[in-house]
């Protein structure tokens, strides 16, 4: 079975990992313990702080407007971009995910509406407290399906000095938040690539979930997906049950590798950094060209090590870090 064999030489392990197994992994356990023992991931020095920028909302493209038409006509879209501006959404539910993260569900203006947010897109949130001179504006990526009706969901991690995340964590059902979108990111379409890799840290997982969910929900999309997800502790692994469900349901097309800075004693996954050695072992090879796409999303330190940072919200900047050293081209990598 994929990455569940006894430790083997690096070359054999690399060949083994790049094949997707024909049998499902056992539920409730790590499928990658032997892999991490074999590659010996290095230690991680401290937590990351995640902050992303966004560019102004733009009118939806023709591709983006093809969101799930229903019998009797196309669905209504809450976010249309362009000159729409911010819309005020009512918080319907606030659920605790872990010690510093909540899932917030906002009602769309009409119960039969869909968000209108294309796969990989984000929104801008705005809040001005009573003692603030200027409003706080932050981007967030929804985790709900693009065709979900009536509501839109966000996973929000609270940061000690984060005014928007703190405000959203303090919100009670019935309160409202100004939201604008979409902010287009990578223009995804089914089967655009044969194999994609999602390299994420912390709440950088949200656009990765949105992308993976769209792939596996579409029976016509046969894309293979590899997830490499770094966190501080096991409880910080967001959407872990959902990722495990995908791994058990699509064992030939999806694999997840988790790396923890502060793992429990029983942890069989990776420990410390997401290393160059791990990426070399589990990612699709760069020689595959356009068939392969690598997505990166996480805190600044992770970008610096793995891909180099973005020059601006609208400029991907040059490729650097481990991915460049491993032979990937700039066109094969997208930084959220």
UniProtKB/Swiss-Prot annotation:
GO molecular function, one term: cytochrome-b5 reductase activity, acting on NAD(P)H
Organism: Phaeosphaeria nodorum (strain SN15 / ATCC MYA-4574 / FGSC 10173) (Glume blotch fungus)
The gene coding this protein: MCR1
Assigned protein family: Belongs to the flavoprotein pyridine nucleotide cytochrome reductase family.
Taxonomic lineage of the native organism: Eukaryota, Fungi, Dikarya, Ascomycota, Pezizomycotina
Domain FAD-binding FR-type: 84-189
Top EC category: oxidoreductase
Co-factor requirement: FAD
UniProt entry tagged with the keyword RNA-binding: no
Enzyme Commission designation: 1.6.2.2
Protein name: NADH-cytochrome b5 reductase 2
Highest taxon listed in the record's lineage: Eukaryota
GO cellular component terms listed in the entry, alphabetical order: mitochondrial outer membrane
Topology class, membrane: Single-pass membrane protein
